[in-house]
Amino acid sequence: GGKDSGVMLNIVLDYMRRHGIKRKIGVLYMDVEASYKRTARFIERMYLDNLDLIEPYWVCLPMTTTNAVSMYEPFWIFWDPAKKDKWVRPMPEYDFIINKDNHPFDFYRENMTFEEFALLFGGWYGRQYGDKKTACLVGIRADESLNRYHAVSRKDKLSYKDKSYSTRISDNIYNFYPISDWRTEDIWTYNGKYHKSYNSIYDLFYMAGVPLSRMRICEPYGDEQKAGLSLFKVLEPETWIKVVDRVSGANFGNIYCGTKATGARKISLPQGHTWKSYCKFLLRTLPEETRNIYTTKFIKFIRYWNRIGSPVSEEDIIELDPDMVINTHEYSRRGKGDKHVVRFKTIPDVLPGLDNKTDFLSWKRMCMAILKNDITCRTLSFSMTKKQILRQQELIRKYEEML
């Protein structure tokens, strides 16, 4: 429902009509329930106006995602049947809506993650057509975020016929990013010049004074998205009431997002603490289940960097205390291979000037993960494992029983 995916779909449909292509394409929309009404109306319009060219997959399945605004309910499930009375929006009722009762997906597991579903959908779609080569067109742009830039431009990926805007996902499945080099201004120039449909929530963003670069359509409780919580209150007050009631901590996130309370601003170390002691103090304040998740992640984080060492440039090595580190004088395989592998004798409390880099281990980085309520530890370069997903689902069931 966002500006980028909308533009990409319009371009594809125009190409198909101009060249007389009649074979339908699958169009996946993953409905996360807690979204703007205007987004749903835009999807409805795009689907209904183009049924001659598309196979609509409007997915309203229960899936797990993070709730970065609460330590006590760190995950939530959109379209959770047990919470139907609290759904932010009623489930749409078109024939092409896919829900728990009618879904055709052999890979779907109850309460799997959004990311896992999106990754597996392409393979499933390809199997419906005899395992032929399948192109998954993804409407992302490299200048939107570092993660998106990395997805498009990383050097270690396999591509389709050396096309830089493609990535091989499996033997016959490839992702393509046809507008990856577009800028935000290009998106709106295209919409205006060719009079294309777009999500009208962007008009409200503009009237609310949101800069073009900050206009994002996403569910409101995630690690990065919580900064947009307050916009629900401004743009769709009737939706905001349900957003607040849907998960624990939503109004706290709205009030305190962007403050020290959520780790968004510069954090000063409390008097009498080191970052190590502060990290251990913060862990003691957490609910036991949440504390165990962080502790497990931190142990893996520490062991990983102790084992492989950190890639450090010669100029950065000069900044390090020689009594703290062992310089192996070997070149790291990470990055360009032009940095030396350095191992720390003990975990440094803080590394001034280096803590914002992902290749370094410090107690401050672990503290910041807790303060940002980053329970999946993405700021420490972790991704969610299948084992963790299953554990999350156990926690969700436990918290539901407690509520």
Task: List the model feature ranges, each with a label.
Residues S5-L403:
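Nucleotide-activated chemistry modules centered on ATP-dependent adenylation/adenylyltransferase
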Residues G2:
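Conserved G/P- and acidic residue-centered "switch" motifs that form tight phosphate/ATP-binding loops
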